[in-house]
Structure formats: C-alpha cells, structure tokens
Amino acid sequence: MNLNLTLLGQAISFAIFVWFCMKYVWPPVIAALEERSKKIADGLEAANRASRDLELAQEQASQILRESKENAAEIIEQANKRANQMVDEAKEQVIADGKRLREAAQAEIEQDVMRAKEALRAQVSVLAFAGAEKILGATIDEKAHSEIVEQLAKEL
C-alpha cells in the first residue's frame, strides 16, 4: 500500500470523525458547558442578591431595633411623667384633705367654745341672780328670772 493512499484515507477518516463530532458530539458538550456556565453565573448572581438582601435585612433590623429603643424610651419617659403626676396629685389631695380636716376641727373647736361660753353665761346669770336674791333678800319669780337671764345672755 501506498503511504499517500493511507494518509489520504486517514485524512478522510479524520475529516469524517471531525464532522461526526461537530455534528453529534460537540453540540451537547457545548450545551452542557453553556448550561454549567449559566448555572455558575446564576449561582453567583443569587449569591450577590442574597448578600444584598442580607445587608438590607440587617439595615432594616437595626432600624427596627433603633425605633423599638426609641419607643421604649418614650414609653418609659411617659410612665415616669405619669408616676410623677400621680405623686403630685396624691400630695395635693393629702394637702387638701389635711386642710379640710384642719378647718373642720377648727370649726368644731369654735362650736365647742361657743357652747362653753353659752353654758358659762347661763351659769354666771344664775349665780348673779342668786347673789342678787341674797343681797336683796327677796325672791324673783321664774318668769322675770328667765327674762332677765335672756336679756343678760344677749348683752354678753
């Protein structure tokens, strides 16, 4: 056999093999490589997206935490103000009650003093009439006695 014919046969066989590979083998391999490349790109994009989402979620979480702290501080401040207000109201109520009790006690004392003065006036007038009877040596009748006592009580 001739070397040229063998070489030509091998070249034709190689060309058929290349054509067969390009027609039937290469497209699935290229498709698999492209699919793999696309999956890798999608994975990288998903990782980037997840990273951005994580950063966004962390920012939102920190913002919510900050707002919660502000709300808690505001609620505590309002509670403290309300507690102080309640204490002030209680103090005012106690002061008002004390003043009212003091005034009531003062009024009761004044009434007791007035009653004591009235009783003292009555006793003084009785003693005065008794002394006057002894001095005069005569008895004054009850009607005249009560009129004089009332008149003296009014004058005193």
UniProtKB/Swiss-Prot annotation:
Lineage top rank: taxon: Bacteria
InterPro entries: ATP_synth_B-like_membr_sf, ATP_synth_b/b'su_bac/chlpt, ATP_synth_F0_bsu_bac, ATP_synthase_B_chain
Bilayer topology annotation: Single-pass membrane protein
One function term, GO molecular function aspect: proton-transporting ATP synthase activity, rotational mechanism
Cellular component terms (Gene Ontology): plasma membrane; proton-transporting ATP synthase complex
Transmembrane helix keyword on record: yes
Keyword Cell membrane in record: yes
Transmembrane segments: 7-29
Record Pfam families: ATP-synt_B (PF00430)
Subcellular location: Cell inner membrane
Regions annotated as coiled coil: none
Subunit structure: F-type ATPases have 2 components, F(1) - the catalytic core - and F(0) - the membrane proton channel. F(1) has five subunits: alpha(3), beta(3), gamma(1), delta(1), epsilon(1). F(0) has three main subunits: a(1), b(2) and c(10-14). The alpha and beta chains form an alternating ring which encloses part of the gamma chain. F(1) is attached to F(0) by a central stalk formed by the gamma and epsilon chains, while a peripheral stalk is formed by the delta and b chains.
Entry similarity comment: Belongs to the ATPase B chain family.
Described function: F(1)F(0) ATP synthase produces ATP from ADP in the presence of a proton or sodium gradient. F-type ATPases consist of two structural domains, F(1) containing the extramembraneous catalytic core and F(0) containing the membrane proton channel, linked together by a central stalk and a peripheral stalk. During catalysis, ATP synthesis in the catalytic domain of F(1) is coupled via a rotary mechanism of the central stalk subunits to proton translocation.
Protein name: ATP synthase subunit b 2
